[in-house]
Amino acid sequence: MKKKQVMLALTAAAGLGLTALHSAPAAKAAPLHDISVSMPSSDTYIIKAGKLNVRTEPNHEGDILGTVSSEQKVKVDRFVNADWAQIHFKGKKAYISTHFLMKTASQAKTTKQTAFYTPTPENGKAKQLSSGTEVTILGWGFSENGGFDFTWAFVDYGGVKGYIHTKDLQMR
C-alpha cells in the first residue's frame, strides 16, 4: 500500500512539474534590431543600485572601469540589447546593466491610433488613443530576465499609468 501511495505521489509531482514547464512563458524582450522606434540619440536614466559597475564590454566579463552611484543620472547613448546600455564614462565608451536603470520622464505623441493597456499588456483593458495624443514616457516593459523590453513603453496618460507599443510613439 505504501509503495502505491509513493508511486501516486511521484506521478502527481511529475505531472505538476511538466505543467509548470509548459505554462505560458513571460513576455520575451524583442531584440533591438527588430524594433523600429524613433528614440532620442541619448536619453537620461537614474541609477537604482547602491553602486553599479561600469564595464568595458556589454557583459559581466568586461573589465570594471569604475562605478556609478544610486540616484546618479547618466546619459544612455544606445542600448546594446535588453540587458546592457552604452554610456560615456571618463571620456570612454562604456557599458552598464539596464537592470538598475530607471528612465527619466519624457514626452511623446502617438503616431497613429493605438491601444493603451492598463494596468499591464497581459492583464489590462485596452483603451484606444487617437493619433497625436500626448503621453509621458516613464519607462519600458521588462524582459523575462529583468532587462528592458523595448516593445512596450510604460506611460502616463491623463494620470493613468499603462503600456503602449513603442512603435506607435514619436519621442521628443
UniProtKB/Swiss-Prot annotation:
SMART domains associated with the record: SH3b
Pfam families the record matches: SH3_3
Signal peptide coordinates: 1-29
Xref: InterPro entries: Cell_Wall_Dynamics_Protein, SH3-like_bac-type
Protease in keyword set: no
Residue stretches making up the SH3b domain: 42-105, 112-172
Key words, A-Z: Signal
UniProt name for this protein: Uncharacterized protein YfhK
Organism ancestry: Bacteria, Bacillati, Bacillota, Bacilli, Bacillales
